A protein has these predicted regions:
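An N-terminal assembly and electron-transfer interface module characteristic of large anaerobic redox
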Residues: 1-447
Length: 447
């Protein structure tokens, strides 16, 4: 399939392990993994002129106990394994910790911990191998996003180790290591499109509150402003301080203090969210749209869902379908990368049916499902079902999800609700975290 291609976006984790989740639970040997890497050489030899942009995630270390996407023993020891990593990392940096490492170790089965540390070592070894492939010219660009990252712990230590190798190989300007994961395919497609057009679009970042620059979003380990710089660069764009000169504007809704989970925004609204100047943000966006500027919204006010108040303001001001992009899902980094990619698509392709459909899917999934419907449906699950197991991809649960999303649209998106058709709602992993949603936007109102 690559013989006649101009470019390849390659997930090294998929090539080596079969995917992101399999990369956390595999028992592959280094020899097997190294043999799989050889495919990259074969592809390069067959099509020497094809651009190859690769990405490979640093294995995460969640701060909770669950085996939903981790090894089985993580359900019992996950929190303790994470906390032990934090204490070990701080100790190496000369930072005192209030928790004694010995007490944590007493709670963890040593065989399980050895397995976990061994898998991390194998994955880190393969991260370095991929760096060598870049150094030797087998791939053209490499991004190493850190999945569900934090400032301290096993994942942060791995990141430091990999950064040392990047410096040793003199590739600081070639390898980007930053918070993210699920959005990186979109980011690299954006970069490839920009490179093939010979352009480096200018991006102006508009904050809802200036203090947001310095916050460290949930599940990440860098200040927001630095993560934004990485994502803009990784997408083949450049940041500008002048919105007049910008090719598109990235509107960022993050708070000026600690980020909260989206599911609690309607019942436990934190006062510091009031520091955001949303009226000024809306007026700014309206004026830029009048000037025919592309505006894309990175709705990272909360983690794991969109800001219902902000979506309401977009609806109230007839802006929902005038913006060039919207995202508000999972981590702040996932949201940022998606919003940038939407803007790049709009820059080259303009408005399209596919773009509009994706936009309304974001409003219903990121705002509707993630922030409101997911929690409500979870509370009403039939006997025998729970958040992690709803027994089916389509059925009682997906039907209720679809019905509640339609209600959400009528209540929160009234300016476009009668133009939306939900053609699919399914639970692809038979759990509540994700929904497989397909929505069509009709330019004419439905009778």
């Amino acid at each position: 399939e690559c013989k006649d291609a101009d470019g390849l976006i390659l997930s090294v984790d998929t090539l080596l392990y079969g995917g992101l989740i399999p990369s956390r639970i595999h028992h592959e040997t280094k020899e097997t993994l190294l043999s799989r890497m050889e495919l990259i050489r074969e592809i390069r030899k067959e099509n020497p002129n094809m651009l190859i942009y690769a990405f490979q995630v640093i294995m995460r270390c969640p701060n909770y106990s669950s085996n939903d996407e981790e090894p089985d023993y993580y359900e019992r020891y996950g929190k303790e394994i994470h906390d032990a990593g934090v204490v070990i990392h701080k100790s190496r940096l000369g930072i005192k910790s209030q928790v004694q490492l010995s007490k944590l170790m007493d709670k963890i089965d040593q065989k399980c911990l050895n397995d976990y540390i061994g898998r991390r070592e194998t994955n880190r070894f393969m991260n370095v191998e991929t760096l060598q492939y870049l150094r030797d010219g087998w791939i053209d660009a490499l991004v190493i996003p850190q999945d569900d990252s934090a400032a301290y712990g096993y994942a942060a230590m791995d990141q430091s180790s990999i950064r040392e190798k990047v410096r040793e190989y003199d590739m600081v300007d070639k390898v980007l290591v930053y918070p993210g994961a699920d959005e990186v395919e979109l980011t690299l497609v954006s970069r490839m499109i920009n490179v093939m057009h010979g352009k480096c679009p200018k991006v102006y970042v508009k904050y809802a509150v200036e203090k947001a620059r310095d916050i460290v979003p949930l599940y990440e380990g860098l200040p927001l402003a630095e993560t934004l710089k990485y994502h803009i660069l990784s997408a083949g764009c450049q940041q500008t301080e002048s919105y007049e000169q910008a090719d598109f504007i990235l509107a960022v809704t993050a708070p000026g203090e600690q980020m909260q989970e989206a599911a609690g925004q309607l019942i436990n609204h934190k006062k510091w969210y009031e520091q955001r100047n949303l009226p000024e943000m809306i007026e700014f966006l309206k004026e830029r749209i009048k000037e025919h500027k592309i505006v894309s919204i990175a709705d990272n006010a909360y983690a794991n869902g969109g800001d219902i108040m902000f979506i309401h303001l977009l609806d109230k001001n007839q802006l929902l379908m005038q913006v060039g992009g919207y995202a508000g899902w999972n981590t702040s980094a996932n949201t940022i990368g998606t919003a940038i990619a939407e803007a790049v698509d709009m820059l080259y392709n303009g408005k399209s049916k596919q773009h509009d459909n994706f936009l309304v899917e974001r409003y219903l999934e990121d705002g509707g499902y993630c922030s409101v419907v997911r929690g409500h449906v979870t509370e009403q699950l039939p006997s025998g079902m729970n958040y992690f197991d709803v027994k089916e991809t389509q059925g009682i649960v997906s039907d209720q999800v679809k019905q509640e999303l339609q209600t959400f649209a009528q209540k929160t998106l009234p300016s476009i609700a009668d133009r939306l058709i939900i053609t699919k709602a399914a639970m692809p992993w038979k759990r509540m975290f994700e929904v497989d949603l397909e929505v069509k936007y009709c330019h004419e109102k439905m009778v």
